[in-house]
Amino acid sequence: VLDVWFDSGCTHRAVLENHPDLRWPADMYLEGSDQHRGWFNSSLMVAVATKSDAPYRIVLTHGFVVDEQGRAMHKSLGNVVAPEEVISQYGADVLRLWVCASDYSQDVRLGPEILKRLADAYFRFRNTIRFALGNLFDFEPEKHTVPYEQLTELDKFMLHRLAEIGDEVTEAYEEFDYPRVFQTLQRFCAVDLSAFYFDVLKDRLYCEAADDPKRRSCQTVIFEIAKALCTMLFPMISHTAEEAWQHLPNWQGKPESVALTDWILVPDEWRNERLAERWEQLLRIRDEVKRALELAKNERRVLNPLEAKVTLLTNESLADFLSGFNVSLSEVLIVSQVSVQTDEANLNAVPAEEFPNLSIAVELAPGEKCARCWQRQESVGQDSEYSDLCARCAEVVRKMRDS
């Protein structure tokens, strides 16, 4: 041994140039921050001296693992966290998620509270995928997929959001910005899916007829979301993504493993900025309605927002905007009934915070509560066979009985 640093600094010449499956220079040198004056430096000096070029295209450095207080881990302090203990308690994917969620550009903290938070984040990912898979139980992609032009506006909007998320995640992976990948996907699952899209879809998924075009429309999009989530999450939580992939509905040409599939491919038609702008404004109105519903619930004017009738008092311009959607506003707002008025006043209306020409009135919807969809509709009791169901649910149940 001439010198350990000189020997390690020569490895790129000894290994990369002499192995048929490798090439010089290396794509990346990856090591701790202490190697700037060590292996990175010695490799660079040897390469410049012998080949007049750097031996690597990229250098990526990371900090060291410390405890939750930022102290170095020592057995004497009793703060060492063994990977096998983490895997035994939480599973390998939570440990992988901790690595990806951490800012490796500085020292990385690890401890019981941090792992608990990451476990919570992991289960949010898992529950999101589980909801998607559970609602694809009767979906056969080659038989039930709805063409893009026949999807509802809401479903098209979610494909646009999926395209945006795919772009951001792809860029973050290419820049080795794994915390950004984690944050982007966590926000997508928690905000876009769980708190909005999946919540809105429950009526369509559970109450419409199995082959209703609106139900197949959202199943088509859920299928695309599930495939994309498996692909984008695979580098982080590989075991969970693979497990989910195996439970996806089969289709012709489905790769045996998510590891063998192509990276997410987004058709150009999914990208629709004009549609997205309209829906983002509608979502802001939805936030205003949720605030009014919460106030009505606190005042016990309604016990459950699903039983409410919402009246939107506004001007002609906003009324025209709201009438331009080919989706039921009651579905998006998750209430029984919605009315848009331009020429009435309501003393119980709550002024919107963001929209100066909008006030929102909330009251108990007229009619009776449907035993199946839980909405209050005036058609409940009108069907002689199913007197406790609304007209929509009675028709669906009758078709189920006769099929």
Model-derived features with residue positions:
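Acidic, turn-prone loop/beta-hairpin segments
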Residues: F139-D167, F198-A292, A296-D320, S339-T342, ...
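Short cysteine-rich clusters marking metal-coordination/redox-active sites
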Residues: C370, C390-C393
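Structured secondary-structure scaffolds
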Residues: V1-F139, M158-K202, T220-L233, K369-R372
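Flanking scaffold residues of small Cys/His-coordinated metal-binding clusters
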Residues: A365-E368, E385
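Cys/His-rich metal-chelating microdomains
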Residues: R376-S379, C393-V396
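Short metal-binding segments enriched for Cys and/or His
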Residues: G91, V396-S403
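Short linker/helix segments within small regulatory modules
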Residues: S379-D388
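A glycine-rich helix N-cap at a beta->alpha junction
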Residues: V327-V340
